[in-house]
Amino acid sequence: MSARDVISKGEAKMKKSIESFQHEIASVRTGKATTALLDRVKVDAYGQQMPLKQVGNVGVQDAHTLMVQVWDKSMVAATEKAIRDANLGLNPAAEGQSIRVSIPPLTEERRKEYVKLTRKYSEDSKVALRNLRREILHALDKLEKDKQISEDEKSRGKKDADDLVHKYEKRILDIVGQKEKEIMEV
């Protein structure tokens, strides 16, 4: 294995970490209706916790309304309860086999809470990136110790790892800035 291989594997893991962060942050509420808002909702269905997506279709009806089309009529009440209990500040209303979820405007206090949550997610992602960097550096040290790479290759690899971390941390900051702007938009 070469230093390039170690860096490539590390970068692939960093990309996955960023994708995970983007998915995480998509579920943070803004003033607009988005299907990602209900991604984390788990419904008590058939004796187990199931993601909402496995119980019905979620669609955007308009800028402030989501519509959940439940496939099994017997699951409507459980789905409505799961959305209400998800601590998202939503008030779902059942209409036959569908559930209308109105997205109320965010209060200033709630907006600030969501900004804090967004920043927490970004910090968690940065920590994950730094841990991946540590893994890369450890692998490079091991390769040098085993005489598979030279000291120069190791130091180039360390510089590349640092550059990757800075690149992806900047990406996280850009994503957070955009999300904060969306959250604070009235």
From Swiss-Prot:
The keyword Cell inner membrane does not apply. Belongs to the RRF family. SUPFAM superfamilies: Ribosome recycling factor, RRF. One of its GO terms (molecular function) is ribosomal large subunit binding. GO terms for biological process: cytoplasmic translational termination. Keywords: Cytoplasm, Protein biosynthesis. It comes from the Bacteria. This is Ribosome-recycling factor. It holds the Pfam family RRF. It comes from Prosthecochloris aestuarii (strain DSM 271 / SK 413). Responsible for the release of ribosomes from messenger RNA at the termination of protein biosynthesis. May increase the efficiency of translation by recycling ribosomes from one round of translation to another. GO terms for cellular component: cytosol. HAMAP family: RRF. It is found in: Cytoplasm.
